[in-house]
Amino acid sequence: MSQNASVGIVMPQKIPFEMPLVLENGKTLPRFDLMIETYGELNAEKNNAVLICHALSGNHHVAGRHSAEDKYTGWWDNMVGPGKPIDTERFFVVGLNNLGGCDGSSGPLSINPETGREYGADFPVVTVKDWVKSQAALADYLGIEQWAAIVGGSLGGMQALQWTISYPERVRHALVIASAPKLSTQNIAFNDVARQAILTDPDFNEGHYRSHNTVPARGLRIARMMGHITYLAEDGLGKKFGRDLRSNGYQYGFGVEFEVESYLRYQGDKFVGRFDANTYLLMTKALDYFDPAADFGDSLTRALQNVKAKFFVASFSTDWRFAPERSHELVKALIAAQKSVQYIEVKSAHGHDAFLMEDEAYMRAVAAYMNNVYKECQQ
């Protein structure tokens, strides 16, 4: 497996949809755009397409670089590319930025066609079901009747799961990684605290901060810092930073003293420079609302009854945000519904963020599963 290979320089595409999209909350987007990137080639049978669904802070830029000078590759470059687990020499891979995002798809930074101004806080709350509906429109646009696989980690895994329920005939395989069939009470609480940090920032201006030439940087920074802590494992964080100080002794003040504090401030500042606060609010609400069993008498097994897809489910031993027990819930429901499922729990010291990292056992498991997906494409 060539982990050094790359898809190279890639160019995003903005796909316009001049059609209304009725959302789960009853509101309608009169039109919408989806920003996408594609890697590899769609075969003549159009049966080798793979959709990558992103997590809270992800986007369409899954792999490669936008220019030779680009310092960073896409957020899942170690997973997607030539000879990698999701092999672009075999598959036509599609990444997109979801509705409500801040990287080119319709969202708070977009122009509201009804007012001629940015949506800002007026962009409607969207759900995982809404995203899947818009992704189905994208599949139609690309001429893809059925995805060979839909792959996602965390919030992305929720989208993969919802696809199998909303459009059972259009998905052959779903890879649900470091995810859950619904958020725990604790996770909903974490999301609310993060939102409160943003909503109570004096620069938030009821979500119309850009028209006031302000940014709720303090609130968004705190939200990201808190979130980042939950994505890491205690032991991994301890091994990386311990109680190391930036100077030789305590300063007996409230500035940055510990190395871990410096790291979190850096992560918060970096996030503020690339992400929109209204988008953060929308993404966390989509997480909170996801609960496919709710439409089936709170029975996940019943929700999965009409699913046609085969499943690959992966969790990570030290992930406490989306603990292995949450994946077990999905696996047990799939078995009860008599569906095909393969499961792996990966031993890792990296917590929830492990799904983004290069772990040999994890990568080999995904590669082996995707190899079987490819064999199906050849039949």
UniProtKB/Swiss-Prot annotation:
Q: What is its main location?
A: cytoplasm
Keyword field = Acyltransferase, Amino-acid biosynthesis, Cytoplasm, Methionine biosynthesis, Transferase
Q: Where do the catalytic residues lie? A: 154, 319, 352
Catalytic activity of the protein: L-homoserine + succinyl-CoA = O-succinyl-L-homoserine + CoA
Q: Where does substrate bind?
A: 224, 353
Tell me where in or outside the cell this protein is found. Cytoplasm
Q: Name one GO cellular component term.
A: cytoplasm
Task: Provide a GO biological process annotation.
Answer: methionine biosynthetic process
| Protein origin, superkingdom | Bacteria
Q: Which Pfam families match?
A: Abhydrolase_1
Q: Where is the AB hydrolase-1 domain?
A: 48-357
| Pathway the protein acts in | Amino-acid biosynthesis; L-methionine biosynthesis via de novo pathway; O-succinyl-L-homoserine from L-homoserine: step 1/1
Question: What assembly does the database describe for this protein?
Answer: Homodimer.
This chain belongs to which protein, by name? Homoserine O-succinyltransferase
Please spell out the taxonomic lineage of the organism that makes this protein: Bacteria, Pseudomonadati, Pseudomonadota, Betaproteobacteria, Neisseriales
